[in-house]
């Protein structure tokens, strides 16, 4: 579905991603783990060109972009339309209701029929358990509810790929479960997803493949049972020990 080859990203002289190669297959869930500053979020943002890589290639089923050459804006927009992004900090429009937030992309960007979009948006809010909150504004919602609206908003553009940037990191611990349940349900429905997360149990249960990144490179990748039970790389072992045994 999506193939990444030789992806590099620098900010000034600081090289954040170094020759990243990965493949995302349709219907699979990939969990990306790594310490703070490892390049996880930058990689995720490069996958839909919120950050433009300096070099490397992204190839979807029907087209590819070579970032070592001049990139057409039309290709950037085409790439972005194929993926829905869920952010750490929700990024909802504060002056719009939950329903209006979900409708925004299809109506304003895709120029779809407003009544048709409204029906779909209500169904999506129902899907994430928030149909009864559709007329509330973000400040009237809990963090977990806001993030679930964010998921519905990302789904509304009918993407081929869902990207989650630490979707529970800004939540109180008691609200984490409600967001993870929605993501698990999407996985069970066969959505293709890349999730940057520190939720090890979630990654074990849901991911088809786990990628561990440190220093801008993929240190190790494999099925969750291998990564969590018998990691091959010493750096992966140290990271997991620190996460699983914090004291």
Swiss-Prot record:
Chain positions recorded as ATP binding sites: 34-41
Location within or outside the cell = Cell membrane
Enumerate the UniProt keywords alphabetically: Amino-acid transport, ATP-binding, Cell membrane, Membrane, Nucleotide-binding, Translocase, Transport
What EC designation does it have?
Answer: 7.4.2.-
GO-annotated cellular components:
plasma membrane
Query: Main localization of the protein?
Result: membrane
Q: How does it sit in the membrane?
A: Peripheral membrane protein
The EC category is translocase
What Pfam family is a match, any one?
ABC_tran
Q: For this protein, what is any one GO molecular function term? A: ABC-type amino acid transporter activity
Nucleotide-binding keyword on record: yes
Q: What does this protein do?
A: Part of the ABC transporter complex TcyABC involved in L-cystine import. Responsible for energy coupling to the transport system.
The text of the family note is:
Belongs to the ABC transporter superfamily. L-cystine importer (TC 3.A.1.3.14) family.
UniProt protein name: L-cystine import ATP-binding protein TcyC
Native source organism of the sequence:
Bacillus subtilis (strain 168)
| Species lineage | Bacteria, Bacillati, Bacillota, Bacilli, Bacillales
Query: Could you tell me the gene encoding this protein?
Result: tcyC
